[in-house]
Amino acid sequence: YEMYLAYLQQWWDTHKDELPIMAGTPVQGDPQAPFSSPAAQAWQTHLDRLQRRVYDVYDIAALALIHYRVYQKAPNEEFGLLFLDEAQDFGIGIYYVLRTLLPATYFTIMGDVSQNIHYDTGLNDWYELHKLFLKNERDQFLLLQKSYRNTIEISQYAGRILEKASSGRYKIQPVIRHGIPVEETRFWSDLEMAEHTAGLISAIQTKGYHTTAVICRDEKDAAKAHSLLSPLTPLTDGAASNFSTGTMVLPIRLVKGLEFDAVILWNLDMQHGPDDPRQAKLLYVAATRALHELHVLNC
């Protein structure tokens, strides 16, 4: 909660001079000029979403807290136990509201802060949650480090990324299951990389593996990779197949929680990206989607 207030204060200090523009003052004296500042554009986007009755989860949390403070005379005792999975996807403000509105409820909160792909809003460490929830003798924090998904080779590779993503606080302990080494290859051109990728996909399928993912940094890179690969190898619509078979080209944000027999990381620049904790978390999520094989390709 304190972190959220600090964020609001920082936002105010940065954007307070732009408030006349946000309120509708003409830009540079032109009454037809569109909103031009980042703050004004963000405000207009927010208004458009409200008109469509699309609400941000943090706005809903704030409104729930206001409603509780103004109208509710007693805490809500409807829920005895609340389970929360993928806890890293929500910021501490959400948990403050839940704890305030449901003071008598027991919580089981599960997640992996190393897989927080919403770096600016989600949980990047468990510390703030400790302060909010671990106040009684019965409250516990349990750290599960065993990785049953990946081979030792993939887990060790991901572990080196994790050193940056979590400052070394949370380490992987893989089960004993060996596989082939992680392959890293650099190419002169996107076309050369696409041709190599098509060959990899064919070899992976020959081994009897059913699912392969070509994981890209974002939707733009995924669209580019798809256009290069589609003339060279069959690709599957992931939504239509429920990820049960074939080769999918996907951005990182769509693969969290999924797993594939083999993963090809497409131009994610694993050598330089991990220096930034924000990027390291994305790379860690991408690398740990692989069950048996991980190939890292860059151009």
Where are the regions that the model predicts?
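Conserved helicase NTPase catalytic core signature
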Residues: Y1-L81, I94-Y95
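Conserved helicase motor core of SF1/SF2 NTP-dependent helicases
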Residues: W43-Q44, Y68-L81, Q88-C299
